[in-house]
């Protein structure tokens, strides 16, 4: 095993163009934020190493383009992903409505037991908010996936979103697994300490 880390998890950020996927990645990986919006061309990725339960986990986070014309490129990145974060913009109802389509993409291209996380970004824009926290939470609960509202601008829940995803993947893989794709399904069901029931910024 590589001495630098115990696990290597590949994460994927998907969602409509302009919802803030790149901003979330920049905030988590580099702790920076930019107001200027430049559309991701194809795929970009960053790496950050975290500590979780005494283990060193290397996160390889892929940021995908939300535009339709890149869909064929990005579909290949679903394969091999351990976790997929579906992002929508809380000020854009259509981006939330399209979450169902993104989830269908996951079902079509990703491995069957991939971990999913729903994220409502831009929760700092309270006066422009159109997607209610409760609506999104109930939707996520009905699918059995965790949900958080985040703000890449204010760094609200960004760290927690990625840590939640890492913890969920680690829990699914079981104690003896490395990132070699061990498809263990005998997961112990236990409370996840990093999962928040509240949005924290609604």
UniProtKB/Swiss-Prot annotation:
<dbReference type="GO" id="GO:0005886">
    <property type="term" value="C:plasma membrane"/>
</dbReference>
<keyword id="KW-1003">Cell membrane</keyword>
<protein>
    <recommendedName>
        <fullName>Ras-related protein ORAB-1</fullName>
    </recommendedName>
</protein>
<feature type="lipid moiety-binding region" description="S-geranylgeranyl cysteine">
    <location>
        <position position="201"/>
    </location>
</feature>
<keyword id="KW-0547">Nucleotide-binding</keyword>
<dbReference type="Pfam" id="PF00071">
    <property type="entry name" value="Ras"/>
</dbReference>
<dbReference type="InterPro" id="IPR005225">
    <property type="entry name" value="Small_GTP-bd"/>
</dbReference>
<keyword id="KW-0813">Transport</keyword>
<feature type="region of interest" description="Disordered">
    <location>
        <begin position="173"/>
        <end position="202"/>
    </location>
</feature>
<dbReference type="GO" id="GO:0005525">
    <property type="term" value="F:GTP binding"/>
</dbReference>
<dbReference type="GO" id="GO:0003924">
    <property type="term" value="F:GTPase activity"/>
</dbReference>
<comment type="similarity">
    <text>Belongs to the small GTPase superfamily. Rab family.</text>
</comment>
<feature type="binding site">
    <location>
        <begin position="151"/>
        <end position="153"/>
    </location>
    <ligand>
        <name>GTP</name>
    </ligand>
</feature>
<dbReference type="InterPro" id="IPR027417">
    <property type="entry name" value="P-loop_NTPase"/>
</dbReference>
<feature type="binding site">
    <location>
        <begin position="33"/>
        <end position="40"/>
    </location>
    <ligand>
        <name>GTP</name>
    </ligand>
</feature>
<keyword id="KW-0653">Protein transport</keyword>
<feature type="binding site">
    <location>
        <begin position="63"/>
        <end position="67"/>
    </location>
    <ligand>
        <name>GTP</name>
    </ligand>
</feature>
<keyword id="KW-0449">Lipoprotein</keyword>
<keyword id="KW-0342">GTP-binding</keyword>
<feature type="compositionally biased region" description="Polar residues">
    <location>
        <begin position="180"/>
        <end position="195"/>
    </location>
</feature>
<feature type="short sequence motif" description="Effector region">
    <location>
        <begin position="37"/>
        <end position="45"/>
    </location>
</feature>
<keyword id="KW-0472">Membrane</keyword>
<dbReference type="GO" id="GO:0015031">
    <property type="term" value="P:protein transport"/>
</dbReference>
<keyword id="KW-0636">Prenylation</keyword>
<feature type="lipid moiety-binding region" description="S-geranylgeranyl cysteine">
    <location>
        <position position="202"/>
    </location>
</feature>
<feature type="binding site">
    <location>
        <begin position="15"/>
        <end position="23"/>
    </location>
    <ligand>
        <name>GTP</name>
    </ligand>
</feature>
<comment type="function">
    <text>Protein transport. Probably involved in vesicular traffic.</text>
</comment>
<dbReference type="InterPro" id="IPR050227">
    <property type="entry name" value="Rab"/>
</dbReference>
<dbReference type="InterPro" id="IPR001806">
    <property type="entry name" value="Small_GTPase"/>
</dbReference>
<feature type="binding site">
    <location>
        <begin position="121"/>
        <end position="124"/>
    </location>
    <ligand>
        <name>GTP</name>
    </ligand>
</feature>
């Amino acid at each position: 095993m590589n001495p630098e880390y115990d696990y290597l998890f590949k994460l994927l950020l998907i969602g409509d163009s302009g919802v803030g996927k790149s901003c979330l990645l920049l905030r988590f990986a580099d702790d920076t934020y930019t107001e200027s919006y430049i559309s991701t061309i194809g795929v970009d990725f960053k790496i950050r190493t975290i500590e979780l339960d005494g283990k060193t986990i290397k996160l390889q986070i892929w940021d995908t383009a939300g535009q339709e014309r890149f869909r064929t490129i990005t579909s290949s990145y679903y394969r091999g992903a351990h976790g997929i974060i579906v992002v929508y913009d809380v000020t854009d109802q259509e981006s939330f409505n399209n979450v169902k389509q993104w989830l269908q993409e996951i079902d079509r291209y990703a491995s069957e037991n991939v971990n999913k996380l729903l994220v409502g970004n831009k929760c700092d824009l309270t006066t422009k908010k159109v997607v209610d926290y409760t609506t999104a939470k109930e939707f996520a609960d009905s699918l059995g996936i965790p949900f958080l509202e985040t703000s890449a601008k204010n760094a609200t829940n960004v760290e927690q979103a990625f840590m939640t995803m890492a913890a969920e993947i680690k829990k699914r893989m079981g104690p003896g697994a490395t990132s070699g794709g061990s498809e263990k399904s005998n997961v112990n069901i236990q409370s996840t300490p990093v999962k928040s029931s509240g949005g924290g910024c609604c």
